[in-house]
Design a protein with these regions (language model features):
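A structural boundary/capping signal
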Residues: 1-146
Length: 146
């Protein structure tokens, strides 16, 4: 991620996010061009899979994948020494948890951490499983390890 390409994103003033019962841990985040988000997520996905393993109901399922993905993205910004985190969030629908990120155009893209795919724009036509109810910018999270 190149800070020269970043835009400061203030979620409190984003009208799209207000529709989804948002929770914000910080005042500002960085948005980046979509291509840079994809490159970061592609680079982090093997580490995510190595960390969480295969899908298992109730122990290693969608909420665990989305929270681990959030952790690895958050940690990459901390390790890079950036002054704030990327605009990457955990999102819940009625039946699923996944992630989303904000690009420099202000679009919010849904990301499926289980298969490393961009599902579509949060404002676009989505399957019910990806119809957001809640968005969460949790701030830095820590994974429990042995």
């Amino acid at each position: 991620m190149n800070l020269d390409d970043a835009e400061v994103f203030v979620p409190w003033s984003n009208l799209t996010l207000r529709k989804y019962d948002p929770v914000y841990a910080d005042l500002t985040y960085y948005s980046f061009p979509k291509e840079q988000w994809i490159a970061l997520l592609d680079a982090l996905h093997p580490t995510l899979i190595a960390s969480i393993g295969e899908w298992k109901e109730n122990i290693s399922d969608c909420d665990n994948f989305s929270q681990h993905a959030y952790y690895f993205v958050s940690k990459s910004f901390i390790n890079a020494g950036y002054p704030c985190q990327g605009a990457f969030m955990v999102v819940w629908s009625r039946s699923h948890a996944y992630n989303a990120f904000v690009d420099t155009e202000g679009k919010i893209w849904i990301y499926e951490p289980q298969n490393n795919k961009i599902i579509g724009d949060i404002e676009g036509t989505l399957d019910d499983v990806y119809n957001p109810d809640k968005v969460w910018f949790p701030g830095e999270v820590k994974l429990l390890t042995k």
